[in-house]
Amino acid sequence: MAKKKIAISCGDIQGVGLELILKSHKEVSAFCEPLYLIDGELLERANQLLHNAYETKTLNTLAIHSPLPLLNSSTIGKVSAQSGAYSFESFKKACELADDKEVDGVCTLPINKLAWQQAQIPFVGHTDFLKQRYKDHQIIMMLGCSKLFVGLFSDHVPLGAVSQLIQVKELVKFLLAFQKSTQAKIVQVCGFNPHAGEEGLFGEEDEKILKAIQKSNQTLGFECFLGPLPADSAFAPNKRKITPFYVSMSHDVGLAPLKALYFDESINVSLNAPILRASTDHGTAFDIAYQNKANNKSYLNAIKYLA
């Protein structure tokens, strides 16, 4: 069977993305046919910063129609509008190739959200762009590994705004889409307030979550969704034995325990998108850029998921 062709967007070149590309190419090529969406000149510069430790001539690259950002010892680890613009164009090209069926999937390396903002890109990040590009799809951010998956009802949203987003109709739509995409038999849903609201004592959000769970289970015809569970104990070992699938109302409630337990191996997946997209679960790691310290386990797992 022919290997799948995977478009790999470069991420922010001032971070660990190019190190991951170079150090992992041999392993990645065992699983798929990688197409790196980056100008070869930038990979050469990256390799020089890494003391020419890697082979670059065998990598299949595709030039990006965007001005080349500076990449040298004085720019690495720093936010740059030019690097932000370049990483966005690399990602957008990957999506275009996937839309045109020229590649089988998209793997995205970490971007810097402030760099995107400085480049006046009107999206918070990868998932926000996908939600705008594919408006007819209920795209869900899910992170995890085989031991634990967490779907986020809200992702890159200020915590103070999450409460207003918790509405029964929207949550039912989300829960059903999550179950359809994952085919999970049991999903544990984290509550929003302390003690999952203590039966309405601490706000009304958890009552809405309960109603959404009941309506979703009724639609499915079986008790798929459990909760709302008090979030402070939802990820205890005895709870994780029930199912690896969780839903969190907010970003950090779900991802803090996931990353405490399985940070190195977890990946980020865009559920319900018309294209296959996966990513590392970590950021640009500017503090260790070009020091040959980047852990590539999450990146390799993202590739394996797509392949």
Swiss-Prot record:
One Gene Ontology MF term: magnesium ion binding
Gene Ontology terms: cellular component: cytoplasm
Keywords: Cobalt, Cytoplasm, Magnesium, Metal-binding, NAD, NADP, Oxidoreductase, Pyridoxine biosynthesis, Zinc
Cited Gene3D superfamilies: Isopropylmalate Dehydrogenase
Pathway(s): Cofactor biosynthesis; pyridoxine 5'-phosphate biosynthesis; pyridoxine 5'-phosphate from D-erythrose 4-phosphate: step 4/5
Primary localisation category: cytoplasm
Binding of substrate, residues: 126-127, 259, 268, 277
Cofactor requirement: Zn(2+); Mg(2+); Co(2+)
UniProt subcellular location: Cytoplasm
EC nos: 1.1.1.262
Example GO biological process: pyridoxal phosphate biosynthetic process
List of residues binding a divalent metal cation: 156, 195, 251
UniProt superkingdom: Bacteria
Catalytic reactions on record: 4-(phosphooxy)-L-threonine + NAD(+) = 3-amino-2-oxopropyl phosphate + CO2 + NADH
Subunit structure: Homodimer.
Miscellaneous notes: The active site is located at the dimer interface.
Purpose: Catalyzes the NAD(P)-dependent oxidation of 4-(phosphooxy)-L-threonine (HTP) into 2-amino-3-oxo-4-(phosphooxy)butyric acid which spontaneously decarboxylates to form 3-amino-2-oxopropyl phosphate (AHAP).
Sequence similarity: Belongs to the PdxA family.
Name of the protein in question: 4-hydroxythreonine-4-phosphate dehydrogenase
Gene: pdxA
